[in-house]
Amino acid sequence: MKLFNYTKYALLFFALFSFVQCSDDETPELINEEEEINRIVIDISSENGSNTYTWNEGDSNFAMQLNSGINYTVAVSFYNASDPNDVEAINPEVIEEADEHHVFFENSSSILTINSASSDQQDSSGNPLGLKTTWTAERAGSATIRLFLIHEPNTKSGNTRSDFGGETDVQLDINVTVE
């Protein structure tokens, strides 16, 4: 009789273990699918007015002109424009996942000073996200400013792209002329 009870419990345990381990779902759920970013819009405003610059994937030259001695507020927006009838704004997801993203402008030039804007979004640690920045056009000249959207950076401060770690979601070279 005791042997029958042990056998019964062993079979019950085996059956329960088998059902828990099996799954009909052969396609695992993607937890964080990477977005396609193929359009970047940069809105620049100052007391003298505003300009909007749009880059689309495949554009070979992205240039903007600024005036010396002027402070600019710069806002960056990312889009998936693969379907022209259904353009998807990526910024809401970047903001929602602020701890996992950072927008960085790599600037090795002395013609511009770039800082976080006070109205910029922040991550849970209070670090600026970089979607809104202030640019001061210090003097006449030209430079290439590199814009990066970084996914899962190791840090959110630095002077060059390599300081941040993580993966680059999108990079854009901006040819800036200050007159």
Residue spans for each PLM region:
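First exposed extracellular module after export/assembly in secreted or surface-exposed proteins
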Residues: 29-179
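Bacterial Sec-dependent N-terminal signal peptides
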Residues: 3, 15-42
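Bacterial N-terminal signal peptides that target proteins for export
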Residues: 1-10
